[in-house]
Amino acid sequence: MDRVTRYPILGIPQAHRGTGLVLDGDTSYTYHLVCTGPEASGWGQDEPQTWPTDYKAQQGVLRQGVSYSVRAYPGQPSPRGLHLETGEDEGLKVYRLGARDAHQGRPTWAVHPEDGEDEEMKTYRLDAGDAVPRGLCDLERERWAIIQGQAVRKSGTVATLQAAPDHGDPRTPGPPRSTPLEENVVDREQIDFLAARQQFLSLEQANKEVPHSSPARGTPAGPSPGVSQAPKAFNKPHLVNGHVVPTKPQGKGVFREENKVRAVPAWASVQVADDPGSLAPVESPGTPKETPIEREIRLAQEREADLREQRGLRRAADHQELVEIPSRPLLTKVSLITAPRRERGRPSLYVQRDMVQETQREEDHRREGLHVGRASTPDWVSEDPQPGLRRALSSDSILSPDSILSPAPDARAADPAPEVRKVNRIPPDAYQPYLSPGTPQLEPSAFGAFSKPSGLSTVDTEAATSPKATMSPRHLSESSGKPMSTKQEPWKLPRGSPQANRGVVRWEYFRLRPLQFRAPDEPQQAQVPHVWGWEVAGAPALRLQKSQSSDLLERERESVLRREREVAEERRNALFPEVFSPTPDESCDQNSRSSSQASGITGSYSVSESPFFSPIRLHSSLAWTVEDPVDSAPPGQRKKEQWYAGINPSDGINSEVLEAIRVTRHKNTMAERWESRIYASEEDD
């Protein structure tokens, strides 16, 4: 078989008889059995047939050459088939090469009939004792058979029976002998490649003019070049272990399961079956034959279509797979001076195409209504058609103004822009420590920052106390019929806000409140999950997915803000320790911020309302009076109190515990001696 074109070099296109070598029930290959007996004495009806005495070479031919018939090169005598052409009239004959006469100590081959099944089968004895002296012609032919067996084996497509690499001696049905038959099979001559090429070309010509199936001849032509016909599963039971069963004498037969299985190894029972039905089903001559690779591709596509059908996904149209990859315009590159060279920063076209396709797929997912749990369960169908959701772009495109000013065209076509669009990026919990629960939420237009509606104050109080009569987040989402993740220009005032309030600055924004951190005493009421406009009440909930990058950005921003608060507090404590140190009733553990941090309650600090407002809370009503704490050390020795692991350092017991569990630096003895200035060891003295 040619490695490139996959044409069988050694196959005969019009083989009158196929050798049915069945490995599995639905294999569909045509096998030709090789016979290299002497040319002079063919298979007579009753005369014995002579086999060459060196059976090892024969075994090699039998093993390797089973799948391809030997085709003699021009000028060589062609080997005979296993049966005469004249014997066609006497019905089907199934020959079985048995290995029964091994006890006689000589390589005797017998063709055994099945015991009583078909009376018309006759027994033929082949004995090596009455071998005619072999002439030069026979040796020559044998050499050719071996060479071609090697050529077949080298192409790597030989079907080895039972998939075992070596099957021992054909005479002994017992455990296979371990003697390698390589030294006999190895050919030490060159293959005549010119002749092989000639033969290949003539084969190709023959295959071109022979139609794919010739009904006049009983059997289909050998598989035409590069064809693996898709095997149709036979509707009969699988065969036992490679044995093919004698078929009924009418021309169209099928394999039957064999009841009596001989103890012969399966590779030895090679049989000749004369029925066209046992071979691979022939496709109609109109259909173009496909190569194995094409077949794999077709099967994969069918599997994919099946899966799409099961999951309820539409078939991807071809125009969806075509992607516009943004590339630099050609005219900017045209310069007569510089030689064109590859841009280093850009990925290859394939990578770019994959990236663009991936983002397209994600956006389509989001636009179809964020089916997270739904894609794999198509049986749940919503009662009303879902309105198209806006395409939520990734976070970096939200931050670029041009993408905000011009939303995606298809989304704009889907439904007109609602009155107010909000971007919720930074939640007010970030500013929450500086606000009290009664104060209104910060508006994004006032501060130029993004904000998210907080759960601490209810919608009604927020709508009542808010200085601008903007719509509450819930009304906003209902009026627009869209999720909260849609975009708004943060630098423009919401269009719904009344004009009168625009210049008013409320003093609450600039009122400084004492920083007091305490965990909320009662857990916040669990809010009823809000049903968006596109959701059906009984349906499985669809979560709005936050893109991973925005989540990371939010987390990073929170940590930065938290760190800034801590640094500011430490700086205040360092500069004015007496002014800012907490009053004794506040210094207990459950009010301290770090202890609540250590206990895992973070991020939910409500800030207590104080009856009076002043820049900072002082110890006395006189501002900036420094009172010495009673137990203070002289100020030179006062060291900055540092919190460690959420433990209050002014607490004596805690510090004792800290001292007890502190890890001292382990030094080995040499290091200790070095630090105690003992430089020389005792041996040196």
Curated annotation (Swiss-Prot):
<feature type="modified residue" description="Phosphoserine; by PLK1">
    <location>
        <position position="581"/>
    </location>
</feature>
<dbReference type="GO" id="GO:0000132">
    <property type="term" value="P:establishment of mitotic spindle orientation"/>
</dbReference>
<dbReference type="GO" id="GO:0051640">
    <property type="term" value="P:organelle localization"/>
</dbReference>
<dbReference type="InterPro" id="IPR042779">
    <property type="entry name" value="MISP/MISP3-like"/>
</dbReference>
<feature type="region of interest" description="Disordered">
    <location>
        <begin position="575"/>
        <end position="607"/>
    </location>
</feature>
<keyword id="KW-0206">Cytoskeleton</keyword>
<keyword id="KW-0131">Cell cycle</keyword>
<feature type="modified residue" description="Phosphoserine; by PLK1">
    <location>
        <position position="592"/>
    </location>
</feature>
<dbReference type="GO" id="GO:0005884">
    <property type="term" value="C:actin filament"/>
</dbReference>
<feature type="modified residue" description="Phosphoserine">
    <location>
        <position position="547"/>
    </location>
</feature>
<keyword id="KW-0132">Cell division</keyword>
<keyword id="KW-0963">Cytoplasm</keyword>
<dbReference type="GO" id="GO:0005925">
    <property type="term" value="C:focal adhesion"/>
</dbReference>
<protein>
    <recommendedName>
        <fullName>Mitotic interactor and substrate of PLK1</fullName>
    </recommendedName>
</protein>
<feature type="modified residue" description="Phosphoserine; by CDK1">
    <location>
        <position position="214"/>
    </location>
</feature>
<feature type="modified residue" description="Phosphoserine">
    <location>
        <position position="382"/>
    </location>
</feature>
<feature type="compositionally biased region" description="Polar residues">
    <location>
        <begin position="478"/>
        <end position="488"/>
    </location>
</feature>
<feature type="modified residue" description="Phosphoserine; by PLK1">
    <location>
        <position position="397"/>
    </location>
</feature>
<dbReference type="GO" id="GO:0005938">
    <property type="term" value="C:cell cortex"/>
</dbReference>
<feature type="compositionally biased region" description="Basic and acidic residues">
    <location>
        <begin position="355"/>
        <end position="371"/>
    </location>
</feature>
<feature type="modified residue" description="Phosphothreonine">
    <location>
        <position position="219"/>
    </location>
</feature>
<keyword id="KW-0965">Cell junction</keyword>
<feature type="region of interest" description="Disordered">
    <location>
        <begin position="345"/>
        <end position="499"/>
    </location>
</feature>
<dbReference type="Pfam" id="PF15304">
    <property type="entry name" value="AKAP2_C"/>
</dbReference>
<keyword id="KW-0175">Coiled coil</keyword>
<feature type="modified residue" description="Phosphoserine; by CDK1">
    <location>
        <position position="284"/>
    </location>
</feature>
<dbReference type="GO" id="GO:0031616">
    <property type="term" value="C:spindle pole centrosome"/>
</dbReference>
<feature type="region of interest" description="Disordered">
    <location>
        <begin position="207"/>
        <end position="253"/>
    </location>
</feature>
<feature type="modified residue" description="Phosphothreonine; by CDK1">
    <location>
        <position position="172"/>
    </location>
</feature>
<feature type="compositionally biased region" description="Low complexity">
    <location>
        <begin position="392"/>
        <end position="417"/>
    </location>
</feature>
<feature type="compositionally biased region" description="Polar residues">
    <location>
        <begin position="589"/>
        <end position="607"/>
    </location>
</feature>
<dbReference type="InterPro" id="IPR029304">
    <property type="entry name" value="AKAP2_C"/>
</dbReference>
<feature type="region of interest" description="Disordered">
    <location>
        <begin position="155"/>
        <end position="181"/>
    </location>
</feature>
<dbReference type="GO" id="GO:0051015">
    <property type="term" value="F:actin filament binding"/>
</dbReference>
<dbReference type="GO" id="GO:0051660">
    <property type="term" value="P:establishment of centrosome localization"/>
</dbReference>
<comment type="function">
    <text>Plays a role in mitotic spindle orientation and mitotic progression. Regulates the distribution of dynactin at the cell cortex in a PLK1-dependent manner, thus stabilizing cortical and astral microtubule attachments required for proper mitotic spindle positioning. May link microtubules to the actin cytospkeleton and focal adhesions. May be required for directed cell migration and centrosome orientation. May also be necessary for proper stacking of the Golgi apparatus.</text>
</comment>
<feature type="modified residue" description="Phosphothreonine">
    <location>
        <position position="179"/>
    </location>
</feature>
<comment type="similarity">
    <text>Belongs to the MISP family.</text>
</comment>
<feature type="modified residue" description="Phosphoserine">
    <location>
        <position position="549"/>
    </location>
</feature>
<feature type="compositionally biased region" description="Polar residues">
    <location>
        <begin position="454"/>
        <end position="469"/>
    </location>
</feature>
<keyword id="KW-0597">Phosphoprotein</keyword>
<keyword id="KW-0498">Mitosis</keyword>
